[in-house]
């Protein structure tokens, strides 16, 4: 049995609707090239919480908390063709989405 080539694409953003929209767009592009695709697989959402003092010198009990969540999706492409890779390279993602590609 021959080894299968695999591409993993991780999308990360602070806006879950943006991640979902672009994950579906990547899937549509890959489906046009007849490659096998798994996903989008939702990865755990990470919540970031920052606590700061409200005043600069006194009132240690008076604090304020800021939080934001980062949402991630994983897309796996099995046996990509050169056409698949070309179409993925031509795709322009918005600035709010971070893309990590591993093969």
Swiss-Prot record:
Amino-acid biosynthesis is among the record's keywords: no
Alphabetical UniProt keywords: Ribonucleoprotein, Ribosomal protein
UniProt keyword annotation of Zinc present: no
GO cellular component, one term: ribonucleoprotein complex
Matches recorded under InterPro entries: Ribosomal_uS10, Ribosomal_uS10_CS, Ribosomal_uS10_dom, Ribosomal_uS10_dom_sf
GO MF terms held by the record: structural constituent of ribosome; tRNA binding
An individual GO BP term: translation
Family stated for the protein in its record: Belongs to the universal ribosomal protein uS10 family.
Function: Involved in the binding of tRNA to the ribosomes.
Quaternary structure note: Part of the 30S ribosomal subunit.
Cited HAMAP family: Ribosomal_uS10
Protein name: Small ribosomal subunit protein uS10
Organism name: Chlorobium phaeobacteroides (strain DSM 266 / SMG 266 / 2430)
Taxon lineage: Bacteria, Pseudomonadati, Chlorobiota, Chlorobiia, Chlorobiales
Gene: rpsJ
